[in-house]
């Protein structure tokens, strides 16, 4: 990813040293990103989700007294952006964009009520057994098999109605069907061709645009000291 836009090279076209420096840094940055992206995942890294990265777009503008950087950072909070100087003429802008979302899938249709063993439950699966019993007058009457059968039926009904210990997590009420916005970590590095005043740098984030103003350092002036 270019450290400066291609148009920025043109402002220093008369000085080949600056142009070569920018192109060298640009090529090195591109090579580093390609190596990191093509590195094979081994060991425990295979089971971890790689960190998503993206590169926000910046405009770099030079005035007579300052350098101005304007970057697109929509939907990011200012507390998640860090700006620092790694050396007197290099500024690094990094941060992170986080959004919680769940990939959506069409809801599955339930074919029927399942029992604890996962088999279809049918009302006809349980029948009360009866047998003929003869009373003292030799009359045949229909009675239930035993009182134990009733107790067993009640226990089965209680187990069927009781919630299972292993319950699947409930699906979220809201889902994202499409996620196209950039999320993850980002980092941009800019190297200025001249000395800058780090103590006077200002930054603001309004309407998704990060604006950084870097004043140029005052030129060193020769001071003559008179001898008394």
Curated annotation (Swiss-Prot):
Keywords: Cytoplasm, Stress response. Signal peptide: none annotated. InterPro entries: A-crystallin/Hsp20_dom, HSP20-like_chaperone, Small_HSP. Its main location: cytoplasm. Residues 144-158 have a biased composition (Low complexity). Residues 49-228 form the sHSP domain. It comes from the Eukaryota. GO terms for biological process: cellular response to heat. It is found in: Cytoplasm. GO terms for cellular component: cytoplasm. The keyword Cytoplasm applies. Residues 34-53, 117-136, 144-174 are annotated as: Disordered. PANTHER family: HEAT-SHOCK PROTEIN 20 FAMILY MEMBER (PTHR11527). The N-terminal putative helical domain may be the site through which HSP30 binding to mitochondrial membrane is regulated. Belongs to the small heat shock protein (HSP20) family. This is 30 kDa heat shock protein. It comes from Neurospora crassa (strain ATCC 24698 / 74-OR23-1A / CBS 708.71 / DSM 1257 / FGSC 987). The lineage of its organism: Eukaryota, Fungi, Dikarya, Ascomycota, Pezizomycotina.
């Amino acid at each position: 990813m270019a450290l400066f836009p291609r148009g920025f090279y043109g402002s220093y076209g008369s000085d080949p040293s600056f142009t070569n420096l920018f192109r060298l840094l640009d090529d090195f940055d591109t090579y580093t990103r390609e190596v990191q992206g093509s590195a094979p995942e081994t060991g425990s890294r295979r089971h971890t989700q790689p960190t998503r990265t993206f590169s926000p777009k910046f405009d770099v503008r030079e005035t007579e007294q300052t350098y101005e950087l304007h970057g697109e950072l929509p939907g990011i909070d200012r507390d998640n952006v860090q700006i620092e100087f790694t050396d007197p003429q290099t500024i690094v802008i990094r941060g992170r964009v986080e959004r919680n979302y769940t990939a959506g899938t069409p809801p599955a249709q339930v074919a029927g009520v399942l029992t604890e063993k996962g088999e279809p439950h049918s009302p006809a699966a349980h029948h009360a057994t009866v047998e003929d019993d003869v009373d003292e007058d030799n009359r045949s009457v229909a009675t239930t098999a035993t009182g134990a059968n009733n107790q067993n039926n009640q226990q089965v009904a209680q187990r069927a109605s009781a919630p299972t210990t292993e319950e699947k997590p409930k699906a979220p009420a809201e889902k994202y069907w499409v996620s196209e916005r950039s999320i993850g970590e980002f980092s941009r590095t800019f190297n200025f061709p001249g000395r800058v005043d780090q103590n006077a740098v200002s930054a603001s984030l309004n309407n998704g645009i990060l604006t950084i103003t870097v004043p140029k350092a005052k030129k060193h002036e020769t001071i003559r000291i008179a001898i008394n």
